[in-house]
Amino acid sequence: MGLTVLALIGGYIVVLGVAAWALDAFTGLSGTGVAFMLSLLALAMVLVQWLFSPYIINMVYRTREPLPGEEWIVAEVEQLARRSGLKPPKVVVSEMNMPNAFAYGSPIAGSYVAVTRGLLRLLPKDEVRAVLAHEVGHLKHRDVTVILALSLIPIAAFLIGRTLVWAGILGGGGGERRGNPMALVAVGAALLAAGMVFQLIVSHFNRLREYYADAHSALVTGSPRSLQRALARIHAAYEHNPHLVEEARSNEMASMLFIVAPLTSLTASPLVDVDYLVERLKEQETNPLVELFSTHPPVSKRLRFLDRLASRIGGIEHY
């Protein structure tokens, strides 16, 4: 599982223990162990979901092995994995029309890189390669596992906070030491607020990992421009095909793993030259409030980031 994840889970359990002790000491609620046990149960459920999630994702997204004529995808991923110092992940194709790709995995199921049928239809091979390199970057950085571990903190805060608020509203704890109901509500509300803050931190971390994956793609392919073009085409496809947005909305399980957030609205013509589209999107204004709650950076920022990166690696050639 890795030392990082074990440390995060250990920290999660310590936080739960300290929270239970503090509540018992300062509110007199002898039943705070219930919240602690509920949170441990939530931890167990999340871990089980993580271990078996690849099988669920494969079913929900109707994945299959590449067909004859699609073997080049496997070859590309194997080459990208070797360049990244990784064991090649399993490559599958999702029978979805929305153009996207995602990486996922667990110790039980192994690592996967999935591309949708819509992506293969939309992008030329060099841009598909750039997208695949982005997903391999997520596997290289263990992003799925680390994001999941970080997400346990707001889950714990929300669960304990909600339990305490309702315990206070219903009259406090039981036993010989009856706690102060208002203190329970106050502590619970503080935990709920802390959970919201932690969730924003997790979203920020997820956006940061997207930049790292973009950088990985640019470095291993030597072509930041290919990824820029791919991002622009995917965004334009969502904007001008509402049914793709609806398909993405109905299959949100892996939306945090997508290369592009599928529910973003942009103004772009699918008939315009892709390089012109890239330049237009770089100039898009961003909404800081929307970005705060998003799991992906705005496309304009990603394109400008790749510009800055290209100026540093301009001498790298395509493989």
Curated annotation (Swiss-Prot):
Encoding gene (name): htpX
Enzyme Commission code(s) on record: 3.4.24.-
Membrane topology, record value: Multi-pass membrane protein
Coiled-coil ranges (or none): none
Residue ranges of the TM segments: 3-23, 32-52, 146-166, 182-202
Protein name, entry field: Protease HtpX homolog
Keyword Cell membrane: yes
Active site: 135
